Amino acid sequence: MKIKVGLIGFGRMGQMYWEEMQKSGRWDIAYICDTDPASRELARNLSPSSRIISDEQEIFDDQSVEAVGLFALANSRKEQIEKAVRSNKHILTEKPIADTIDKEWEIVD
């Protein structure tokens, strides 16, 4: 059974994770989200079966999505992690998990 996931951020790291997820065959990449139009266009070409979006909230609102991959900039991760927790999603995230040590401790707490 594949794990249904939504990816947020399709820059260099998001593409790397996408590629490895594709290779593993264990993931159903349901969504790819990026605010950059060029990144969304690339995602459309590479992953035609994924829904390509610019609003990450769609991923958090979709109850069928089991996990979220957070590969956007670190300054957005604290809020994204909090949304994922509230949405009962498993979290895969690039490091660091936040852009300041104080925000990292807030996440841990």
Regions found by a protein language model. Give the residues of each.
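N-terminal Rossmann-like dinucleotide-binding module
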Residues: M1-S47
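Charged/polar, solvent-exposed surface patches and flexible loops
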Residues: E41-N45, E58, D109
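Beta-loop-alpha module in the N-terminal Rossmann-like domain of NAD(P)-dependent dehydrogenases
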Residues: S50-V108
